[in-house]
């Protein structure tokens, strides 16, 4: 989610103090005390996720305090990852734990992978006994497997390494995200048939993009629409190529285009192409993903009817609670509590927020209440 955020320091490691209650099991028989911060109620608050968190907190409250030092290693500490940092730090504080949220200074390539591995290795060797990581690629697997082999619970967040020994993945399930977005677009289209263009990815070589696109495609086809996928061009000249291809597809489509959706953060390209082809929001229903400034502009103008946002805050917020649950309750007992959002034994789906254009300001107020943003 690329939007204007409250100023955040680029901190490679923000450490929160450890309270007396987290220094191992209490010989007096005292139970673990957890006090969640009060967040203003909102229609956008994911009630089912909140129920799961509250269930986990209740069960944790029946146990004696345990010693846990949480290392959370992200890819970056800005923009998209900032809500994860804020969520993780809030949960660490509520649990009265020692914890650190870190990230490499490099954002891609071998250097970033090596730096992320070095952070994990350093933190594990210094005594952290719970690990969460948003891995770049398979090159991040050795520290994850080493931690698991040492009986340290490991969670992957936002991006997964299914072939590793991690205990759980917390994040968006792209196939389900695509289905949700497809359902949103169906609800926005007034026609019962016609062509729908997806600016997405139709090559299984990138599983996340492919799964999201195919999830939406399946829902739309089942609803009776003819679906055309334009594989988005991510090169330096990609925007011009996408705009030309989309405008041509709109002009040439038979049956006519009644809906469009961008599956990634460049979704605004659909709106630009529709304008180029002389179409309005009354002609074509357009839905999007994420909050690029141009996407927001088109939502305010009425050309984009809705967007979808991943729940990075909850990815970060849930992670320390789940790691603590693994330690205090056991992994299977914790996963049983998480069952409403588990898609299988090792993946937890945080879901999507659906934001109609008419409720954009209300959504920004909700983000402000979480401490992760201010309105555009």
Q: Can you say where each PLM-predicted feature lies in the sequence?
A:
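Extracytoplasmic "Venus flytrap"
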Residues: 39-63, 67-87, 91, 95, ...
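Hinge/cleft segment of the Venus flytrap/periplasmic-binding protein
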Residues: 29-66, 220-223, 318-376
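An alpha-beta-alpha
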Residues: 70, 74, 88, 180-232, ...
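C-terminal motif of bacterial Sec signal peptides marking the signal peptidase cleavage site
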Residues: 17-20
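Flexible loop/hinge segments that line or gate small-molecule binding clefts
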Residues: 138-176, 292-300, 304-305
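Hydrophobic alpha-helical segments within soluble ligand-binding/sensing domains
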Residues: 48, 52-57, 116, 170-196, ...
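Hydrophobic alpha-helical
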Residues: 121, 130-149, 216, 234-298
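Bacterial signal peptide processing site
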Residues: 22-25
């Amino acid at each position: 989610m690329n939007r204007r955020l409250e100023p955040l320091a680029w901190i490679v490691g923000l450490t929160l103090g450890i309270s007396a209650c987290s220094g191992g099991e209490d010989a007096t028989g005292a139970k673990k005390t957890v006090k969640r911060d009060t967040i203003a109620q909102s229609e956008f608050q994911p009630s089912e996720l909140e129920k799961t968190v509250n269930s986990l907190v209740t069960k944790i409250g029946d146990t004696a305090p345990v010693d846990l030092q949480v290392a959370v290693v992200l890819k970056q500490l800005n923009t998209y990852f900032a809500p994860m940092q804020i969520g993780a730090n809030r949960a660490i504080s509520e649990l009265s734990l020692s914890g650190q949220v870190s990230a490499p200074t490099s954002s891609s390539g071998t250097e970033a992978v090596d730096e992320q591995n070095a952070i994990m290795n350093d933190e594990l060797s210094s005594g952290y006994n719970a690990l969460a990581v948003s891995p770049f690629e398979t090159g991040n697997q050795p520290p994850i497997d080493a931690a698991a082999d040492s009986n340290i619970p490991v969670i992957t967040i936002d991006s997964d390494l299914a072939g590793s020994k991690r205990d759980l993945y917390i994040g968006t399930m792209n196939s389900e995200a695509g289905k949700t977005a497809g359902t949103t677009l169906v609800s926005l289209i007034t026609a019962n048939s016609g062509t729908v263009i997806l600016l997405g990815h139709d090559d299984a070589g990138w599983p996340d993009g492919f799964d999201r696109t195919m999830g939406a495609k399946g829902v739309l086809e089942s609803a009776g629409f003819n679906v055309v996928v334009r594989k988005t061009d991510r090169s330096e000249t990609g925007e011009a190529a996408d705009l030309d291809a989309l405008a041509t597809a709109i002009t040439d489509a038979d049956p006519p285009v009644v809906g469009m959706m961008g599956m990634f953060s460049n979704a605004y390209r659909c709106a630009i192409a529709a304008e180029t082809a002389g179409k309005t929001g009354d002609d074509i229903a357009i839905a999007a993903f994420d909050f690029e400034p141009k996407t927001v502009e088109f939502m305010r103008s009425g050309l984009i009817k809705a967007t979808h946002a991943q729940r990075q805050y909850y990815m970060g917020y849930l992670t320390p609670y789940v790691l603590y649950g693994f330690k205090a309750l056991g992994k299977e007992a914790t996963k049983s509590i998480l069952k409403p959002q588990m898609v299988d034994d090792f993946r937890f789906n945080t879901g999507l927020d659906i934001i109609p254009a008419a409720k954009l300001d209300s959504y920004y107020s909700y983000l402000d209440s979480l401490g992760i943003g201010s309105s555009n």
